Swiss-Prot record:
The keyword Lyase applies. This is Ribulose bisphosphate carboxylase large chain. The disulfide bond which can form in the large chain dimeric partners within the hexadecamer appears to be associated with oxidative stress and protein turnover. It catalyses: 2 (2R)-3-phosphoglycerate + 2 H(+) = D-ribulose 1,5-bisphosphate + CO2 + H2O; D-ribulose 1,5-bisphosphate + O2 = 2-phosphoglycolate + (2R)-3-phosphoglycerate + 2 H(+). It is found in: Plastid, Chloroplast. The record marks 334 as: Transition state stabilizer. Its main location: plastid. SUPFAM superfamilies: RuBisCo, C-terminal domain, RuBisCO, large subunit, small (N-terminal) domain. It comes from Psilotum nudum. GO terms for molecular function: magnesium ion binding; monooxygenase activity; ribulose-bisphosphate carboxylase activity.
Length: 475
């Protein structure tokens, strides 16, 4: 296969190609508390031993190259190299293995998700000796996570800002996502917020198009926010999408949102990039703005089981880069998401300390120390009949977001919002009274619909709507 390198200058320079495993496969290595640990699912090409493949991953994502080079003798590769310290076969899969790799902390720039990913996944995924490669999980040691600011505010600060406790927050993505004028867009925002939602949202691809320029949208949305707040006595928000073609333009939009008095802005963190996202997160913390994160493009990276990167890794990276909310699937809606796997990365977003649990896809114990948590957002193909399951699955520290499930109500946007708010309040009350949402959920919704005509109408419209497909990314 490919190479390796001498690790000590004293051994002298010997030109040529060596097996990677001679230097980078170290099964006796004792991992350090400061190492970044990675779990890769790898499928070697036929004839490539798994030890050689794992060592190649460690080498090509750290100090190695395809041949021995003279300048190896000018540094200490034993100090800086990545090490494949364990390999295990994947149960039920032919020629698939989990390779565990440890990276010394000094390989990475402090506070830079961009640099971390450039090193760990930047080049090795195109390596010919591997048929497929997927990064399943990372362990971020406190020594590295403490170099990141993390979420601008976090869950508790957001609740204090909104003065809303003891229940999930309710949101709605304005539809149709493209084509509305700024004034009609603002009207839809007002109707949804007046009806009882906490948030409305720009869709991920609403930026600044000819039919609705960003400044016009921001102005009409701000008017809707203040009017709905005055009428309901509740603090309201709309995720104003600041994503733009340049970082400078993105910051200009965030600044204008703050000047209007908006409480929250939004960013598409994968299409916008981690450098832009971290810059925006710093601005939001300094200026009191909450930051909603959309994961547009994630399925290009994470949906295939054998190649790419699992969303739990992208979720950890987002927590480090900065965001107060991030979309996390629904389990029950139209988007991909198996329950145990989803709850695994939801805990990685919210909790301070998460134990290793392979049944939920968590390969390493993760200690975030004091880094604030991120609210998971359940969005995509959900409606009032899903409310009991969503409340039971995601708990209070979440945002439940109904787009079509609000704006598709037969009586209009405000009644759609009323239906969702009534359904949520009924589920929270039933849970607090000790009722089993998983078993009694439909009964709880039916009981609430008897005194809410808006909910009754919603129940009738969506009584047969289900998204029953097999999940691709399973454990």
């Amino acid at each position: 296969m490919s190479p390796q390198t001498e690790t000590k200058a004293s051994s002298g320079f010997k030109a040529g190609v060596k097996d990677y495993r001679l230097t980078y496969y170290t099964p006796d290595y004792k991992v350090s508390d400061t190492d970044i640990l990675a779990a890769f699912r790898m499928t070697p090409q036929p004839g490539v031993p798994p030890e050689e493949a794992g060592a190649a991953v460690a080498a090509e994502s750290s100090t190695g190259t395809w041949t021995t080079v003279w300048t190896d003798g000018l540094t200490s590769l034993d100090r800086y190299k990545g090490r494949c310290y364990g390999i295990e076969p994947v149960a039920g899969e032919e020629n698939q293995y989990i390779a565990y790799v440890a990276y010394p902390l000094d390989l990475f720039e402090e506070g830079s998700v961009t640099n971390m990913f450039t090193s760990i996944v930047g080049n090795v995924f195109g390596f010919k000796a591997l048929r497929a490669l997927r990064l399943e999980d990372l362990r971020i040691p406190p020594a590295y996570s403490k170099t990141f600011m993390g979420p601008p505010h976090g869950i508790q600060v957001e609740r204090d800002k909104l003065n809303k406790y003891g229940r999930p927050l309710l949101g709605c993505t304005i539809k149709p996502k493209l084509g509305l004028s700024a004034k009609n867009y603002g009207r839809a925002v007002y109707e949804c917020l007046r009806g009882g939602l906490d948030f409305t949202k720009d869709d991920e691809n609403v930026n600044s198009q000819p039919f609705m320029r960003w400044r016009d949208r921001f102005l009409f949305v701000a008017e809707a926010l203040f009017k709905s707040q005055a009428e309901t006595g509740e603090i309201k928000g709309h995720y104003l999408n600041a994503t733009a073609g340049t970082c400078e333009e993105m910051m200009k939009r965030a600044v204008f949102a703050r000047e209007l008095g908006a409480p929250i802005v939004m960013h598409d963190y994968l299409t916008g990039g981690f450098t832009a996202n971290t810059s925006l997160a710093f601005y939001c913390r300094d200026n009191g703005l909450l930051l909603h994160i959309h994961r547009a493009m994630h399925a290009v990276i994470d949906r295939q089981r054998n190649h790419g990167m699992h969303f739990r890794v992208l979720a950890k990276a987002l927590r480090m880069s900065g965001g107060d909310h991030v979309h996390a699937g629904t389990v029950v809606g139209k988007l991909e998401g198996e329950r145990d796997v989803t709850l695994g990365f939801v805990d990685l977003l919210r909790d301070d300390y998460i134990e290793k649990d392979r049944s939920r896809g968590v390969y390493f114990t993760q200690d975030w120390v004091s880094m604030p948590g991120v609210l998971p957002v359940a969005s995509g193909g959900i409606h009032v009949w899903h409310m009991p399951a969503l409340t039971e699955i995601f708990g209070d520290d979440s945002v439940l977001q109904f787009g079509g499930g609000t704006l598709g109500h037969p009586w209009g946007n405000a009644p759609g919002a009323v239906a969702n708010r009534v359904a949520l309040e009924a589920c929270v009350q039933a849970r607090n009274e000790g009722r089993d949402l998983a078993r009694e959920g439909n009964d709880i919704i039916r009981e609430a619909s008897k005194w809410s005509p808006e909910l009754a109408a919603a129940c009738e419209v969506w009584k047969e709507i289900k998204f029953v497909f097999d999940t691709i990314d399973v454990l």
